Swiss-Prot record:
Pathway: Carbohydrate degradation; glycolysis; pyruvate from D-glyceraldehyde 3-phosphate: step 3/5. Keywords: Glycolysis, Isomerase, Manganese, Metal-binding. It is an enzyme of class 5 (isomerase). One of its GO terms (biological process) is glycolytic process. This is 2,3-bisphosphoglycerate-independent phosphoglycerate mutase. Its cofactor is Mn(2+).
Length: 510
């Protein structure tokens, strides 16, 4: 069997590009290898943050999201952005599970109940999504629209719910129908530690309007809670109804839409609406059409508006189907990223996939050993390239990220210099076997070690672009405006392989 000429992808974790050289460990370190590559080889900058990787606009990238996008060859939207995007595109209003639940309630002249964590926190839910759900129910003809507000105060300031509640009171006034029907703190409605007595408080409020307190409006109910010294998170069960209004309880034939997208704190209260349940004794158990916004658990037999997106034909799976061999190699710190996350959340190896793990150094913080285990990793990487065994090699060097996180500037420069030396050896090996290589990063970090706004130490990732450099014999010219999800199609193109239909990323080679 003839020796293979591998295509390598080297991911320099946390190696972003920033024009300003102030507190920029990447620009200021001595990097003869990278300098020569950028001077002489095809290169460009690509985006690794925000909507380009499926995160909210302007949000910095991270390693999990970066590797998932690289391996998928398509933008993988996180739940928050996926749902926000569906609202903007008009798809949300046509989501089958929501349409069916609302229409069945409207037809039977029943109520549509919408519940969820009412805040702009964006961790478990977003009030913009809840707003869209209320508008959708109204547009589809629901007359009774009841909003059950779980109050936040953890992912938002402790007393910040008033603006959100006022916003929805105004919406219902504009619609001329519907109302905020109940308030309760997330401490009760969103427990995740099997404190079923707390969950029962929320369940009884929803199904019986059983509440310690009542108020005529949501804002009045909140003010009363503050007067009792209850912050948002701990607001006791409060039924909202003005004089002459009926109780807004969940009854047979009603639709219930739970607008939290994060599963861990949505599971328990949801399980209380499933027949097989032993968390507490239910005084009533209405036959409702319950819709979960996302899948809270695989064993909850309820409708799901946004089922999990399964990633078919990721880069690793596709290579395996083509009978190709591949190696994933990194230090402990980023091993999961080049394996599990790169494979779209699949733990097991694909056929033809091998993995090599190099132990990260046992130090308290990596500024104490900025080169980390790059010499050992490089030795294994060079041996793998020269072995002739692999069609593709995916390697991650963690230094720029892990040392960047320490905030120690001198150590970050040393980390970049150690990386440069390693990259030089890998480039030599690739050239020796007439292979090809792309050098890139999953997000930025070490290019900004001082926060320009505050003047304090900057230890976080950045939302800056990352380099993409080609090493090899092909006459390559890169397109501008690429992003991480374009890397897999580009690599398949460089290897002369077909690109699967699921990969919507672009080939960045002209």
């Amino acid at each position: 069997m003839s020796a293979k000429k591998p295509l390598a992808l080297v991911i320099l974790d946390g190696y972003g590009y920033r024009e300003d050289t102030a507190s920029n460990a990447i620009a200021n370190a001595k990097t003869p290898v990278m300098d020569a590559l950028i001077a002489n080889n095809p290169n460009t900058l690509i985006s690794a943050s925000g909507m380009d990787v499926g995160l909210p606009d302007g949000q910095m990238g991270n390693s999990e999201v970066g590797h998932t996008n690289i391996g998928a060859g398509r933008v993988v939207y996180q739940d928050l952005t996926r749902i926000t995007k569906s609202i903007a595109d008009g798809e949300f209003a046509e989501t089958a599970a929501l349409v069916e639940a609302i229409d069945s309630a409207v037809k039977a002249e029943k109520a549509v109940h919408i519940m969820g964590l009412m805040s702009p926190g964006g961790v478990h839910s977003h009030e913009d999504h809840i707003y869209a759900a209320v508008e959708m129910a109204a547009a589809r003809g629901a007359e009774k629209i009841y909003l059950h507000c779980f109050l936040d105060g953890r992912d938002t300031p402790p007393r910040s719910a008033e603006n959100s509640l006022q916003r929805f009171q105004d919406l219902f006034a504009k619609l001329g129908k519907g109302r905020v029907a109940s308030l309760v703190g997330r401490y009760y409605a969103m427990d995740r530690d099997n404190n079923w007595d707390r969950v029962q408080v929320a369940y009884d409020l929803l199904t019986q309007a059983k509440a310690e307190f009542t108020a005529e409006t949501a804002v009045a109910g909140l003010e009363a809670a503050y007067a009792r010294e209850e912050n948002d998170e701990f607001v006791k069960a409060t039924a909202i109804k003005a004089e002459g209004q009926e109780d807004a309880i969940m009854q047979d034939g009603d639709a219930v839409i739970f607008m939290n997208y994060r599963a861990d704190r949505a599971r328990q209260i949801t399980r209380a609406f499933v027949p097989a349940f032993d968390g507490f004794e239910r005084a009533v158990f209405p036959a409702i059409n319950f819709v979960m916004l996302t899948q809270y658990a695989a064993d909850i037999p309820l409708a799901i508006a946004f089922p999990p997106a399964s990633l078919e034909n990721t880069y690793g799976e596709w290579l395996s189907k083509q009978g190709q061999t591949q190696l994933r190699i990194s230090e402990t710190e980023k091993y999961a990223h080049v394996t599990f996350f790169f494979n779209g959340g699949i733990e097991n190896e694909f056929e033809g996939e091998e993995r090599q793990l190099v132990a990260s150094p046992k130090v308290a913080t990596y500024d104490m050993q900025p080169e980390m285990s790059s010499p050992e990793l490089t030795e294994k990487m060079v041996a793998a390239i020269k072995s002739g065994k692999y069609d593709t090699i995916i390697c991650n060097y963690p230094n720029a990220d892990m040392v960047g996180h320490t905030g120690v500037y001198e150590a970050a420069e040393q980390a970049i210099e150690a990386l440069d030396e390693s990259v030089g050896k890998v480039v030599e090996a690739i050239k020796e076997v007439s292979g090809q290589m792309l050098i890139t990063a999953d997000h930025g970090n070490a290019e900004m070690m001082i926060d320009p706004e505050t003047g304090g130490v900057h230890t976080a990732h950045t939302n800056l672009p990352v380099p993409l450099i080609y090493v090899g014999d092909k006459a390559v010219e890169f397109k501008e405006g690429g992003k991480l999800s374009d890397l897999a199609p580009t690599m398949l193109s460089l290897a002369g392989l077909e690109i699967p239909a699921e990969m919507s990323g672009e080939v960045l080679v002209k």
